[in-house]
Amino acid sequence: MEKIRRGYYQGINPDDFSEVGTVIRLFPDAILCMDTALRYYGYSDRTPGDWHLAVSKDSGKSRFKIDYPFVKPYYVEPAVLELGLTTGTMDGHAIRIYDKDRLICDCLRYRNKMDKEIFNKAIQKYIADPEKSIPKLMEYAGPLRVKKMTKDLIGVWL
């Protein structure tokens, strides 16, 4: 057994150890977002050093102060937390993750906190993605307060 944090233990079998398994057990209410989701969808070729997690702004802050795995929480209004939520699979584990359209809205929202190269590549790959949904993107942009920016930045490419 390995102690992850006070009250959190994990059995170690080198064959079935997965960092994503640890993250989803520690933070079952969290949603993968930003750099982690960009990597999942292939919009970024960089592997993030931290797990980027969206959580309710009402959730406790201290639970994210752990030594491993490295996590970067994004505190989101509860009203829009589950907007664009979908599920996926990573390393054999079911994950909660934002869909591509919500992800791009978040990138626009946090563009000043992101690496510019990652931001630009994410936008370009989204535009080239045949599975993108511009109506859904615009639907999410309203409640996330990035509608004008979405029209200005994404509209140029269409």
Regions found by a protein language model. Give the residues of each.
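Nucleic-acid-binding surface
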Residues: K3, Y8-L158
